[in-house]
């Protein structure tokens, strides 16, 4: 499964369960060169998911099966967890756990 397919699946699951979804879409500026219009430190997670009435906020980095996390992505996840935030690195094989997490309230 491509990362983009996995991402669409997670976004659809989140929306079906009442989550608001933030995803920064990159734009191709020339062949092989992509940028994101939003500024910030590199490696920020792919998705931010929120459900206000449940008090839920999740940061999720998505990878295709076998995909590698960059040092900057690891740093963001560690930093977010260090603040008490809920942050994950999710792979397609994590789908059962993702469904469970998106279906329940804040742990």
What is the predicted function of each stretch?
Residues 1-107:
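Catalytic phosphate/metal-binding cores of nucleic-acid and nucleotide-processing enzymes, i.e., regions
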